[in-house]
Amino acid sequence: MKAEPHLASETPHDKVSCVHAETCGGCPLIHLPYPEQLAEKRGRVVGALSRFPALELIYTSAVEAAKPIAHYRTRAKLMVGAEGAIGLYARGGGHQLVDIEHCQVLAPAIVNVVDYIRAMLRDQASALGKLGVQEQDGAIRAIDVREVIDEVGAPPKLLVTLVVSRDVDLEPCKRAAEALVSHVPEVAGVSVNFHDGQSPQVLGNKSTHLLGATSLFDLLGRTKHLATFGSFAQAHRGQALAIHNAVFEHLKQLGRLSELRVLDLYGGSGAFALALAAEGATVKLIESFAPAVEQARLAATKLKLTISTECADTADALKLAIARNEKHDAIIVNPPRRGVSPFAREAIAQLSPQSIIYVSCNPDTLARDLDHFTRLGYAAASIKPFDMIPLTEEVETLAILRKAQVPPPRTIHEDEDILVIEKAAYEPAVGSASTPLSLTSRVRSIPGMSEAICVTRVDLATSGLVVFVKRPDLLDAWTKALDSESARRIYIAVVRGITPQKGAITRELRDGSRVHAARTRYRRLAVSSGHSVLRVIPEQERQHQLRRHLAAVGHTVLGDERYGHAPTNRYFEEKNGLDRLFLHCVRVEFEHVRRGQKLIVEAPLPGELRGVLERTSGAGTLKFLESKNALGHGGSSSLPPTPDELHDRGSALDVSATPTIIDSRRSSPEAAGDGRASVIYTPPDADDKKVD
């Protein structure tokens, strides 16, 4: 049953061959020469940044190449299937497991222990009982193997985790642990992790140590830190060191390392914090995963280093740091794929460091966050990608942000009375003591606009058009004009599920002790990955009217924490970086007070929302919506236009008086008001089109 050692072979630096390449989904770029892989990864970073006007001119450096590109991975999370198959799911989706017996990217020591576990599971004489694979009435679901090297040139050691169902008998697990330690010299410790039922995550939140070491020092980056079962590890040792060196080179530009105060956010088990402490810096680590914080503290004690640690949610910890008036010269952020939360971004800027060092594993959320930091007064000084996981589409990026002037907002329309401004999500229209930077403060920074006043508003987590008057004496007249029945605001929303083609929702909404009549009209423009892209028009603009009405009929706005569907919101944040409402005020129409003409102003769909649509359904949905002029063009026009202008435009945002019929469809109990609801649907137009 003993597996033969699986040794690394010499591999040309620009090409790796694998017998599993056609079926395994683990290395999608393996067919490309290595220089082309690097070009594709740089293109991914450039493409993500180019969605945002504030970032599209930032230069992205060439990708730092990895050496080696084979047998480099320090950690493997592999699924276990029938007859002891161990590997990854096949490319193309689904749950067909590919038994990977000759993986070209795993470190040789990891390959050896995986081979032994495979042989052990297939050996009917092993007496493992219920530890057998789940598809054969056993309990094992997956394995997680971490390679640890504590000194340069030292032989590797392994920490092995067996992922099992919660009701498994631990005796067979203990026998398996004893067999692993006895037959595979590299195995230093074994634990069992209990999977959380139907969770898509490989690891559950509870583990039990079985045998051997509970943690080991690992040299990953510039110093050692403690590795334990299931803890995060950068995939490539050489690239981890390259990123650490680049971070330290930047910090040296701020002053002597021994004199710097550094805040390490999403600090994990202390890879950055411990390395900085070794240079004499004053370091504070914040991490929400308690076992990782404990490992950082223990490592600091063993290495005789001083670091401050705090186990807390990042945004909550930053609020306390602001209240304590903490001062930091630099802040390092190394978040998971979903990026930095909006409130954490605001708090980081309020702490006012000289520099923000952002290490990202997801170009899409990096671009989203850099766009927000730009509005908060931190501009990207450099963008450097690293090939952390060769042969895959993934790319690690180091962004250096420095203090800069807060830019003025984008003005879509300006005349003698008003400004129509494009507001970003999580930018308050009017400031407060806790959020002194606001859209109003940015508008008033424009020369000659010191008296500008906001007339219309949208929700904090909504983006889109906001109207300002230039002087206080204009406020009353323009407030009446924008509240009149002829004025209209049109939104683009993506909502959960597939709605009818057209409809109207009439429902009274309660505001404290008062009840208000309210009506919302919508039209489905497209379907994206099972969810509806809508043009939505509130007729009265009550508080949260669109969100409450759509929730009332069971089609909540994606990203709506208050009225929405929590599992769907979590999925879209984790998988697609949607950390806001998918709701954008794309168009405003009103009669100009001074000119008497109807003015139409549009703001294009922001980059983060375009990215979500592209990731969920490919470029087809975006192209279709753009062909219908449904996503806004970033300009203004007056009515009446010439007949030719009206014909050429043909926008899906134009509203026609289509006859309606009443449908007896029942409203959802998610309704956010107390009044009676009626739902009215219109027959679909002949040119209505669905894009899946």
Model-derived features: where do they sit?
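Short beta-strand segments enriched for Tyr within beta-sheet-rich domains
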Residues: 542-550
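RNA pseudouridine synthases
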Residues: 404-519, 526-529, 605-616, 624, ...
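Residue-level signal for inorganic ion chemistry
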Residues: 27, 143, 190, 362, ...
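Short hydrophobic/aromatic beta-strand or adjacent loop that forms the aromatic wall/cage
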Residues: 75, 394-399, 490, 583-586
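Short cysteine clusters
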Residues: 18, 24-27, 361, 541
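Extended interfacial segments that mediate partner engagement and assembly in macromolecular machines
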Residues: 5-15, 23-130, 136, 155
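Pseudouridine synthases involved in rRNA/tRNA modification
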Residues: 405-409, 413-417, 427, 549-663, ...
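Rossmann-like S-adenosyl-L-methionine
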Residues: 5, 171-406, 661-662, 680-681
